From Swiss-Prot:
Name this protein carries in UniProt: U-box domain-containing protein 8
Pfam families membership: U-box
Keyword Lyase among record annotations: no
UniProt superkingdom: Eukaryota
EC number(s) given by UniProt: 2.3.2.27
Pathway: Protein modification; protein ubiquitination
Reactions catalysed: S-ubiquitinyl-[E2 ubiquitin-conjugating enzyme]-L-cysteine + [acceptor protein]-L-lysine = [E2 ubiquitin-conjugating enzyme]-L-cysteine + N(6)-ubiquitinyl-[acceptor protein]-L-lysine
Function: Functions as an E3 ubiquitin ligase. Involved in the age-dependent pseudo-self-compatibility process.
GO biological process, one term: protein ubiquitination
Keywords (A to Z) from UniProt: Repeat, Transferase, Ubl conjugation pathway
Impact reported for residue 184 to A: In strain: cv. C24 and cv. Cvi-0
Length: 374
């Protein structure tokens, strides 16, 4: 039996199901291959809004949507084998679940059951996501985030994360007070709740106005930095991703630096968290970030190790960071030369990534004192 694919899963450019969804700074999601080709062709506007993009547009992985897409084949196979009336029944079923969730007389056990089933429904159906939002259930979900019951808190955060997949909900959730709850969870929640809360911040931060709101909210950034320092692998990865999303907004870079993040990010990068290198690649654009990086002992060695063993994105950012630091310090130039970076850069001449080739060329010119030709 045939079934309809959710439009949310299709790239607006290729119209194909996305295999690696990424979020453009305009807030819209595209398949990485398609939007990268758009950017590499010299386009500096959003394909949908036509609004201008920065010279080097940031592409933020949409982990939540990717997870939904990966699960979709399994779910859709089960759904397609059901009678159409049963699929339609899920919509009427969702209304009963919403009623239970918002009812003041419902027990925690009843609310947990409703949340669990709504999370499952909203994962794959944008119309149900809109229905939940329009019904006023967001307030009830936010109240559950305040609960001392960790399971109830985790399910309510998961529901809010699913709702945030709708672009129209991103600003609305912030207006409803979700940031305060997220910050509290980042401070005192369970490990799973902290990871989901950080992922929710990433989803909300794809909207420019939310970047500013989140960044200026007391303790929001410091809570992420703290999670990066003491969290488990999942928590650290999600906190670094959230910081990356927030730091695409220039005013947030100083805030992140002022929270003492640079040594923590360097340590994370040294332990293999390459998302931390990407955050440093944004922080190096502000003066305070460069000053803090120059103070961290062994930082150049960490970046050189990424050049030798990292993925393409990590190499790209490491080259960029080294060039920024070398432009400001002769001592760092000498250290970078001693680490054999000139030779490493020559090895990138035939790299598949145009950005890596360009960054390597620029760094070599900086290290050798050769002006770049216009």
């Amino acid at each position: 039996m045939a079934f309809d694919l959710p439009n949310d899963f299709r790239c607006p450019i290729s119209l194909e199901i996305m295999s690696d969804p990424v979020i453009l700074q305009s807030g819209h999601t595209f398949d990485r291959v398609s939007i990268q080709q758009w950017i590499d062709s010299g386009n500096r506007t959003c394909p949908i809004t036509k609004l201008p993009l920065s010279e080097t547009p940031y592409l933020i992985p949409n982990h939540a949507l990717r997870s939904l897409i990966l699960n979709f084949a399994h779910v859709s196979l089960k759904e397609s084998s059901r009678p159409r009336t049963q699929q339609e029944h899920s919509h009427s079923q969702s209304q009963a679940l919403i009623s239970t969730l918002v009812s003041q007389s419902s027990s925690n056990a009843s609310k947990l059951e409703s949340l669990t089933r709504l999370v499952r429904l909203t994962k794959r159906d944008s119309s149900i996501r809109r229905k939940v939002t329009e019904s006023g259930a967001v307030r009830a979900a936010l109240d559950c985030v305040d609960s001392c019951n960790q399971v109830l808190q985790e399910k309510s955060l998961s529901l809010l994360l699913n709702l945030s997949l709708e672009d129209d909900n991103k600003v609305g959730l912030v207006a409803d007070g979700v940031i305060r709850r997220i910050v509290t969870v980042l401070r005192v929640g369970s490990p799973d709740c902290k990871a989901i809360a950080a992922t929710l911040l990433t989803s909300l931060a794809v909207v420019e106005v939310n970047k500013a709101t989140i960044g200026s909210y007391p303790d929001a950034i410091s809570a992420l930095v703290s999670l990066l320092r003491v969290g488990n692998d999942r928590e650290r990865k999600e906190s670094a991703t959230a910081l990356y999303a927030l730091c695409s907004f220039p005013d947030n870079r100083k805030r992140v630096v002022d929270c003492g993040s640079v040594p923590i990010l360097v340590e994370a990068a040294d332990s293999g968290l390459e998302r931390a290198v990407e955050v440093l690649g944004l922080l190096v654009k502000c003066r305070g970030g460069r000053e803090e990086m120059s103070k961290v002992s062994g930082f150049v060695e960490v970046l050189v190790n990424v050049l030798r063993n990292g993925n393409l994105k990590g190499i790209q950012y490491s080259l960029f960071i080294l060039n920024c630091l070398c432009c400001c310090s002769g001592e760092i130039v000498d250290e970078v030369k001693r680490e054999g970076v000139v030779e490493i850069c020559f090895g990138f001449e035939d790299n598949e990534s145009e950005k890596i080739r360009r960054n390597a060329t620029i760094l070599v010119h900086t290290l050798l004192g050769i002006p770049m030709s216009s």
